[in-house]
Amino acid sequence: EDNEYLWNALLDGQIDTIGTDHAPHLLSEKEKSVVFGVPGIETSLALMIDAYNKNEISLELIENVMSNNAAKIFSLDKKGKLEEGYDADIIVVDTNRQWTVKKEEIESKCGWSPFEGYELLGKNYITVVNGNIVYIDGEFDLTVRGDDVSE
C-alpha cells in the first residue's frame, strides 16, 4: 500500500527527487541496536532502470528525479545537464543487462543489500566525473575524485 502510494506520487510529480542516504551498517550492527537506513547507493539506479524496463517509469523521469531536479534544488549550477559549460558528469546504462544482486559483489563496507537475490534488468556500465571515467563495467579508477559540491 505504501509502495503504491509512493509510485503514484512519483508519477504524478509530487516527488521531486529520489536519493539514498546510503547507511551501510554491518548486519552485526543492525542486530545489536536500532540503526536506521539501508545500503542503497549501489542499487538505486539499477532498481529504477529495472522499473523502466517494466514500463513503470520513463527514462526522462528517472533523469529528472535522480539528477536534474536535485541540481536545481541545491543550486548546483554546473550539474544536472549534459550541455556545454556544465561538469561532464555522465552515466552510461546498459538497459538490457540482466544481473542478480549478490552480497559478494557489494562494494560498500557493509557487504550486504536488502535487495540481495533481486534479478534486475539494467545496470550502470560507465560513470564519468568531470570528464574522467571513474567506473567501467565493475572496475573503479580510485585515483579520480569529483569536486566538493558543498562549497
Language model: regions and residue ranges:
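Short, surface-exposed, polar/charged, turn-prone segments marking secondary-structure boundaries
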Residues: 1-2, 44-47, 118-123
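General structural signal for secondary-structure boundaries
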Residues: 1-2, 58, 102-103
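Active-site glycine- and acidic-residue-rich loops that bind
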Residues: 1-7, 73-75
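Short, flexible, glycine/charge-rich loop motifs used to bind or transfer phosphoryl groups or to couple energy/partner
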Residues: 6-8, 80-81, 117
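His/Asp/Glu-enriched, well-ordered alpha-helical/loop segment
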Residues: 11, 17-96
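A short helix-to-beta-strand connector/capping loop
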Residues: 13-14, 123
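C-terminal cap of metal-dependent C-N hydrolases
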Residues: 87-148
